[in-house]
């Protein structure tokens, strides 16, 4: 399993619709609406890096999303 964390910026006023779209995606485990540099922090758990890449691409296609930044977790 691969854990990815994506920080998302959205168009002001589009937070609710972006949140609703994120919640429809099966691999997303948690969605946090945050204050500061980003609007959302999304935690994903997927089978591999290629699946993570596809999921992030789907997030970027959501109407209202302006930017994303993703980090990948590693086991110690």
Regions found by a protein language model. Give the residues of each.
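A compositional/biophysical signature of low hydrophobicity enriched in polar/charged and small residues
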Residues: 1-76
């Amino acid at each position: 399993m691969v854990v990815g964390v994506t920080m998302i910026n959205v168009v002001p006023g589009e937070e609710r619709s972006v949140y609703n779209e994120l919640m429809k995606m099966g691999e997303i485990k948690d969605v946090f609406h945050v204050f500061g540099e980003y609007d959302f922090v999304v935690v994903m758990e997927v089978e591999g890096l290629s699946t993570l890449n596809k999921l992030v691409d789907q997030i970027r296609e959501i109407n209202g999303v302006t930017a994303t930044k993703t980090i990948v977790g590693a086991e110690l």
